Amino acid sequence: MSEVKTQIKPKAIFLMGPTASGKTALAIALRQKLPVDLISVDSALIYRGMDIGTAKPDETEQSLAPHRLIDILDPALPYSAADFRKDALKAMEEITAAGRIPLLVGGTMLYFKALLEGLSPLPSANPEIRAEIEKKAAEQGWEAIHQELASVDPVAAKRIHPNDPQRLSRALEVYLISGKSMTELTQISGEALPYDVYQFAIAPKDRNVLHQRIEARFKQMLTCGFEDEVKSLYQRGDLHEDLPSIRCVGYRQMWSYLSGEIDYDEMVYRGICATRQLAKRQITWLRGWHDVHWLDSEDFEQSLNTVLQVVSA
């Protein structure tokens, strides 16, 4: 009688949460307690020269707990969820091969989802079709594009705001390339993550606490030279406000200030508001997440102990 061997999956840890929730501090503490190596899951931290406005781990934090997938790309270059999944899987394999546990920490929920569930078979971007859409938008307005999308993909049109040209263009582009709606294609599952994943979400129980942290951190960034950081990017000449890097919260608002569209006080106000809106979207994602252990960022020791207990069980 032959024995059926069950393959034991390697462990991985997800530490997710909204911006300014204390993820980095907890990840560094876990690095001192567990055989983990960190992988950043953040669509802003990938860019070089964008340190202050992204709250990128500083030299001290990086020396305590080196993060992979930080500073891997110039701000002029694109980076997709598919790129992240490929890079993250490679990093996870290397960490696991060294006998350690990958600890993935960040707030870009789309990246976590792509890694956990795999990617739907969406077609690659087509510059010609994208140009046609943008030409039509220039002539008729993005509202017309939104109406066209609603006729072929009402679910996506309901989700995407008429003033969001990037997502509108992509959703319509997918249909024009494939003949199928983005909604239909995203229901097709990709390759699941071959790891035993322990998932944690950290956030304050009181949203007002998070709002206060966000405001304090944004003002601290300004004190630390955020304006000069964005000015260096602005003066390069090859970057513009439609790039994903410059659309990052804080950077977009500072860019508008440097270009003379808004004054300084308005930049601060919009930057704080945009960061709060980002945090709200991140929390909304997490509330719909399955199999996640919630941690209170106001009780650091309890959060640390909870992770240690769950992972060691």
Swiss-Prot record:
What organism, scientifically named, is this protein from?
Answer: Proteus mirabilis (strain HI4320)
Family, according to the entry, reads as follows: Belongs to the IPP transferase family.
Q: Which reaction does it catalyse?
A: adenosine(37) in tRNA + dimethylallyl diphosphate = N(6)-dimethylallyladenosine(37) in tRNA + diphosphate
Annotated protein name in UniProt: tRNA dimethylallyltransferase
The entry's ATP-binding residues are 17-24
One matching Pfam family, short form? IPPT
Quaternary form? Answer: Monomer.
Key word Metal-binding present: no
The UniProt entry, under SUPFAM superfamilies, shows:
P-loop containing nucleoside triphosphate hydrolases
EC annotation from Swiss-Prot or TrEMBL: 2.5.1.75
Please give the cofactor(s) recorded in the UniProt entry for this protein.
Mg(2+)
Annotated segments matching region Interaction with substrate tRNA: 42-45, 166-170, 247-252, 280-287
Annotated positions binding substrate: 19-24
Site residues, Interaction with substrate tRNA: 108, 130
Tell me, what does this protein do in biology? Catalyzes the transfer of a dimethylallyl group onto the adenine at position 37 in tRNAs that read codons beginning with uridine, leading to the formation of N6-(dimethylallyl)adenosine (i(6)A).
Q: Which GO terms describe its molecular function?
A: ATP binding; tRNA dimethylallyltransferase activity
Q: Which domain of life is it from?
A: Bacteria
